[in-house]
Amino acid sequence: MTKESADKQQSTAENIAVSMQNVTISYGKSAAVKDVFCEISTGKVTAFIGPSGCGKSTLLRSINRMNDLIEGCTLKGRVLFDGVDLYDAAVDPVEVRRRIGMVFQQPNPFPKSIYENVAFGARINGYTGNMDELVERSLRQAAVWDECKDKLKDSGCSLSGGQQQRLCIARTIATQPEVILMDEPCSALDPISTLKIEETMHELKKSFTIVIVTHNMQQAVRVSDETAFFNAETVENRSGKVGYLVEFNDTQSIFNSPQQQATQDYVSGRFG
């Protein structure tokens, strides 16, 4: 290998945050999503789209091993992060979840003060810096500081739904992850709150890699740089369906010039 090709290979590797290699995830004996090859680019927003039941949320949760908490859920294949297989026996799943944070569909603040919602995760992860500065910085990055700065001792549950979701984003940021996963983070929010979350995501990608699952195709167009479209097919002798990756490309290509007919049908609203 020449130095030029070696440098190019290293540069390519540095641009990939997460690499999913032939990933199949099953619940019991039934596969939920199969044979996925997918590389998530560093410093970009990647959207997973597709009809209900195609396995996109299951796949998202596999990136930080949240599926480990589901009895009977197994993964075959490899999920690489910084060149390390996250499912290797030597890997600590707690550390995985610190470095790859998660924001859920429903806002779920802790029953603690706004300040403690942000500080708690950092504290239990051994943060020894200035906690006040970390809390303020995290709330600012999540675009909720101005709404919270004068009531940091109030309960996080006293905030509006949109504010709670941005608080949850701040809580995730405070643990200093490298990747943030978002599972339909705006589905329970009103349009104004959704817009604020989307604006926040544009700022966050300057510091974090983001992967978002969304049923809202317009949202995928607005916020993402790259999009993966998943579909599902029936399985012989089974009542359910199994998801699979149809097409993965930059977002403009997926929505304006898709390579697969199924992608064209989905983004044009013919099914979903």
Curated annotation (Swiss-Prot):
For this entry, the protein name equals Phosphate import ATP-binding protein PstB
- Reaction catalysed by this chain? phosphate(out) + ATP + H2O = ADP + 2 phosphate(in) + H(+)
Recorded hits in CDD domains, A to Z, give:
ABC_PstB_phosphate_transporter (cd03260)
Q: Which family does it belong to?
A: Belongs to the ABC transporter superfamily. Phosphate importer (TC 3.A.1.7) family.
**GO function terms (MF aspect):** ATP binding; ATP hydrolysis activity; ATPase-coupled phosphate ion transmembrane transporter activity
| One Pfam match | ABC_tran
Q: What is its EC number?
A: 7.3.2.1
* Annotated localization: Cell inner membrane
- Tell me yes or no: is Transport among this UniProt entry's keywords: yes
Q: Name one GO cellular component term.
A: plasma membrane
- UniProt enzyme class: translocase
Domain ABC transporter: where? 18-257
GO BP terms: phosphate ion transmembrane transport
Keyword annotations for this protein, in alphabetical order, are:
ATP-binding, Cell inner membrane, Cell membrane, Membrane, Nucleotide-binding, Phosphate transport, Translocase, Transport
Sites binding ATP sit at: 50-57
